[in-house]
Structures are given as C-alpha cells and as structure tokens.
Amino acid sequence: MIEIAALGKTYRSLFGSRTVPALDNVTLRVAPGEVVGVAGPNGAGKSTLISILLGFLKPTGGQARIAGQAPRAYVESRGASYLPELLPLPPRWTTETALRRHATLAGVPAEAVAARAQHMVEWLGLEEHRKKDVRQLSKGTLQRLGLAQALIGDSDLVVLDEPTHGLDPLWTQRFRDIVRELRRPARCILIASHDLAELERLADRVAILHQGRLERVVSAGVAAADEEPAVYRISVTGAAEMIARIFPSATPVEGRANEWRLRGRVPELNRGLSELIAAGAVVVAFAPESSRLESEFRAAVEGR
C-alpha cells in the first residue's frame, strides 16, 4: 500500500548557507494489513517522514506513493486517520464537540456523525468526559480523545505519532487491543514511537531511522511471536496472589519488592496482563527484560 523509493528531504539552514538533510535515500514498503513501527532518536527523520506521507511536505528527492497515488492526492480523496504528537484543540470545546467537528472534517456523513461520535466515546472510555471542556481533561484523557478523533474517520491509512504517550498502564494495554481491532486486510498502520517495548508488542516490523537514513527494518514481537519465548518484568502493587495465579512460573526479582520476572511468548503474556488488569491489579510497569529490538536499535544508532 505504501511505496517509498529513495526518498529524500533537505531543509535550508537558518541563514540559508547550507542544506540540512532530514531524510536521505529512504526506501520502504508497507503492505496492506501490516502494522509497521517507526523508531529513531530525536532528529532521526520520523516527523519528516510522517509529514511527507500525509501530504504536508513534498520530498526533495525520490518519491512516496500510497495505493498508487501521491500522498496529498490519496489523503484528499480517501482520508487518513492521524494522531499528531501534540493535539491542538480550542480549550473551550467539549469532548463531544471535538469528536463531532472532527467527524465532519473526516467526511463522516452528517446523519452518521452523532452515532459515530458515540461509538468513539464508548470505545475510548470517554463517557464521563463527554461534556467536559478540553482544558479540563488530564493528559491521558486528552490522549484518548486524540485517538478517538484520529480513528473516527475509519480510513485505510492510520498514522499514530507517540500514541501511548501519557496513557496509564491500563489504557496502554487497552491501546494494544485497539490496534488488534483496527487490523484489517486493506488497512496500513504506521506507529511512530520512542517506546521500543510497545513497538515490539504492537508491530509486525519496525523501521529504525538515524540521521535521516533508514538503517534497518526489524521483525518485531507480533511477527516473531512464534519464536523463542520472551522475558518480561512486571511491577504490580499488592497483587502477589494474582501474579501467582495468572503467571504460575513467575519468579520474584531479587531485591525489588512487588516486581516479578515472566517468561513466555508475547501473545500469552499480553493475555495474562489483560486478565491481571481486569482483576483489579495496579500495574506500575510491564516491559521486556531484554529486547532484540532494543539491541538492533542500539546497533543501528551506533553504526554497528
């Protein structure tokens, strides 16, 4: 669905004396039905790549095509579900107003706007916030509103920039479920994030950018779920009995209260985590103890 070939983008320096490369000869293909993560240090080119794919910027070299069209033409004709890293909204808009306005902008028929907004309110757990002004929302709730706005148009191109930023562990886990629900054969999902652990759990592949170059593309947790088991650490407040019941092979981490080491395949661990949260446990942290993606990321950035 997405075809990127030798893509380049340069900017003029502040005083115009030299050019600064933001993207350098990037080639990548994203198939329909695929979830691809985009990772890289600050300044690696992630935002520039997203801006080109959404038609906000034009490349200075190479090309990008989405379903055979130039990005701007695709977005104008078929739309895109986009969550920006920063969500600009009038502070006096209510949650419901923001959703309805965005539904209209996304091309939802007028007669379907109310029902679509209600669906997103229920899906993203915004019922108690629907009449609140945006300025009254917590950071995590505002992020959920951003997700609701991004997904209300139901596009086949989904681009999410730091989607779990500000979410608590409960909604971070719920977001994983949402991504699984979003998958469909014709849809392409791009997730840009600094959170390598989340990308490893969510994506089929992760593209690692560094200084504008695509250093490598790594198979992630979803695609590698049938490979050797992963080792995760979980920190939970006052839930030792639940841990023992849901993860019988869990072992306490020496010297760390309320922290356990889990071993298993990623889908199995995710199911156990969902069960733990549903049982009322307060999950403080859940992350891989050792990550192949993290190793690949470090090697790419360090030039190994």
Give the residues covered by each predicted segment.
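Conserved ABC ATPase "signature" region
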Residues: 100, 104, 111-129
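A short, flexible loop at the N-terminus of ABC-type nucleotide-binding domains that lies
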Residues: 1-4, 9-25
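The feature captures the beta-strand-to-loop junction immediately N-terminal to the Walker
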Residues: 36-41
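C-terminal coupling/interaction segments
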Residues: 265-304
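Catalytic Walker B motif of ABC-type/P-loop ATPase nucleotide-binding domains
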Residues: 158-162
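Conserved ABC transporter NBD signature motif
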Residues: 62-78
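ABC transporter nucleotide-binding domain
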Residues: 176-263
